[in-house]
Design a protein with these regions (language model features):
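Gram-negative (and chloroplast) outer-membrane scaffold detector with strong preference
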Residues: 40-141, 178-183
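Sec/Tat signal peptide C-region and signal peptidase I cleavage site
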Residues: 10-16
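Bacterial N-terminal signal peptides
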Residues: 1-9
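Predominantly the C-terminal beta-signal and adjacent terminal strand-loop region
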Residues: 134-186
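Surface-exposed strand-loop-strand hairpins of Gram-negative outer-membrane beta-barrel proteins
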Residues: 30, 51, 57-65, 158-169
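Extracytoplasmic loops and strand-loop junctions of Gram-negative outer membrane beta-barrel proteins
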Residues: 18-21, 56, 106-113, 160-166
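N-terminal targeting signals for Sec/Tat export/insertion, comprising classic cleavable signal peptides
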Residues: 27-47
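Transmembrane beta-strand segments of Gram-negative outer membrane beta-barrel proteins
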Residues: 16-25, 89, 175
Length: 186
């Protein structure tokens, strides 16, 4: 029994890494996307963060704003992980089903009268700042810009299944703007 306790105490020290759990309040509110992120300290300057966003809910009326996407990101911290400035590079992949919505930057202008369904992939760079509120809590702001590629099918209306076209698009755009509440697990 004593040997087991000794092994467990060593394993805890050897494998101890700082982990943060977070929720992006800005994207959650703007896109009505429940989300959860996890960030793992890799070294004295690097962390790996991954966020999952999911909205299965109808938007009301003929509107449709269903989607899910993941956004992993490798971050370099200027001072220490989970405190101050950071730069990152990340990937993203997701699936969407959007109709009767206004999308920013002139993306899919036809989405106001037609439904678009497809997937997207992307790569981007980011900058952010983590405010330490207490030993366990933090507030993080981040903005990313990147290259996105999407393949889509276009339908005449939000509910009907009559396909009117398909295609793909490439564009450079903001890929993330976040204000996240962060909880540190140690």
């Amino acid at each position: 029994m004593l040997m087991l306790l000794a092994l467990l105490s060593c394993a805890g020290k050897a494998g101890a890494q700082t982990v943060a759990v977070k929720s992006d309040l800005l994207t959650g509110g703007m896109l009505a996307s429940p989300n959860l992120g996890v960030e793992l300290k890799l070294s004295e300057r690097f962390t790996l963060e991954a966020g999952v966003y999911y909205n299965p809910f109808p938007a009301g009326g003929d509107k449709r704003w269903k989607h899910w996407f993941v956004q992993p990101e490798l971050r370099y911290w200027m001072c220490q992980p989970y405190g101050g400035h950071f730069f990152g590079t990340g990937l993203m992949y997701g699936v969407y089903n959007v109709a009767k919505a206004r999308l920013p930057f002139g993306l899919f202008k036809g989405v106001r009268s037609e439904r678009y369904e497809g997937d997207f992939t992307g790569v981007g760079i980011s900058y952010g700042y983590h405010f330490i509120l207490s030993p366990r809590w933090g507030l993080e702001t981040s903005i990313s810009v990147g290259f996105l590629h999407t393949r889509y099918e276009r339908y005449r209306c939000a509910q009907c299944g009559e396909k009117t076209g398909s295609g793909n698009r490439n564009f450079i755009a903001p890929t993330k703007a976040s204000i996240s509440l962060v909880y540190m697990m140690q």
